[in-house]
Amino acid sequence: MGITVLKNEGLDFHARISTPLSEIDDDIQKELLDLTKKVKIAGFRAGKVPVSIVKKKYGTSVRNDIIERRINHSVNHVIKEHNLNIIGRPKIEELQNESDKALEFTVKIELLPKITIPDLKKISLDRPKLEVNSKDVEEQLEKLAALTKNYTKESKAKIKDGDQVTIDAIGYIKEKAFEDGKLNDFKVIIGSNALIPGFEKQLIGSKTGSEVDVNVTFPENYHAKDLAGKDARFVVQIKAVHTAEPTVIDDEFAKKFQSNSLEELRTHFTKQIENESEEAINTIMKMNLFDKLEKLLDFDVPESLLEQEKNILKSGTDKNEQDESLLKDKSSKEITAYYNKLALRRVRIGLLLAEYAKSKNLQLEPDDLRKVIMQQARNFPGQENMIFDFYKNNPRAIEGLKGPALEDKAVQYIFNHEIKLKEKKYTKEELEKYLEAEEQRITLV
């Protein structure tokens, strides 16, 4: 076998490989001889089929199989001989297998970069810490009580905040009724903001049996694009008004929610608030860590990974409102530059974390995958069981989660063992403002 290196620069390795035809012919002959002992052909006893007959029937397929095996063997030999750290499948080009002298082809191999892990102990980050107070917990109890109110008492008085109103409504845009603009026996709690902004407020002061003209403007980000930003008028019939019976928040109330006492329910809400904030804090800290890492990384990345990441980003833009808003009114050149920069950042950080996980011998445990699946499920409120069933019945989908799961494990290991974390305490209100500001600041990743 002859090997001529054509290119060995950066992350590209190209070589021309040739194998004497005599070696190919020898392999073909051996394969055909083996087949004479195995194949069954009418008119011949088992194991007594002449080679010429076998060659006539199977010669082409045997030759193709031998050539494919030779190519794979040769490529693996080159990879081992040159100690190549490859990514993806090698590309075979300029294949010549009809020559009377040799099998020849060019192999193009993309390499992984050599990654030097930076000194992570020099990195420092703030670690927000939420201090849950009694006011936060009482707010959650009040919200729960509001959701479980009994609207049994019919009212003839004027509508006020907190009342449950049953309405019929027809919506008009430029005096023409529009599709999906009709409501029948629709129940709405005044002040719940369940309807278009401004709708509920205009019902206040009316009574059962009255007709109200409600004028609103659909939000620019309204889910029905054909209605977004448009002015509309609704003719509303007030069919019934009910007031809520007062809800007493006590031990009996708590028992309705699988708690033995009100104190136990308070403890549950304290932990829930802490857990919800912890997930948001971890996301922001991860992004802030990536911002720091981005400035430390300058290695080249495989072109195939870069293109793959750009395609993922582009295909997800229409589902990402923040991304879509950021690119609005940008030129094609600016959009391309944005995707190039973001894709490069993601690939570099992904490769670094994979190398870091390898250096620390981090292994995925079942709990690591469960956490990632739980995160996925939380993105689909009310459909959690469907998400769990999907991953339970799709092993290939589970495989797709292993990369993100290992990345998360590496990030948590870095937080716990490498970088300096400075704890900073926040109230719930302060933390919400901080997280909102950070979400606006950080680079999308």
From Swiss-Prot:
Coiled coil: none annotated. Residues 162-247 form the PPIase FKBP-type domain. It is found in: Cytoplasm. It catalyses: [protein]-peptidylproline (omega=180) = [protein]-peptidylproline (omega=0). One of its GO terms (biological process) is 'de novo' cotranslational protein folding. InterPro entries: PPIase_dom_sf, PPIase_FKBP_dom, Trig_fac, Trigger_fac_C, Trigger_fac_C_sf, Trigger_fac_ribosome-bd_bac, Trigger_fac_ribosome-bd_sf, Trigger_fact/SurA_dom_sf. Keywords: Cell cycle, Cell division, Chaperone, Cytoplasm, Isomerase, Rotamase. One of its GO terms (cellular component) is cytoplasm. It holds the Pfam family Trigger_N. One of its GO terms (molecular function) is peptidyl-prolyl cis-trans isomerase activity. Its EC number is 5.2.1.8. Involved in protein export. Acts as a chaperone by maintaining the newly synthesized protein in an open conformation. Functions as a peptidyl-prolyl cis-trans isomerase. PANTHER family: TRIGGER FACTOR CHAPERONE AND PEPTIDYL-PROLYL CIS/TRANS ISOMERASE, TRIGGER FACTOR-LIKE PROTEIN TIG, CHLOROPLASTIC. Belongs to the FKBP-type PPIase family. Tig subfamily. Consists of 3 domains; the N-terminus binds the ribosome, the middle domain has PPIase activity, while the C-terminus has intrinsic chaperone activity on its own. This is Trigger factor. It comes from Rickettsia peacockii (strain Rustic).
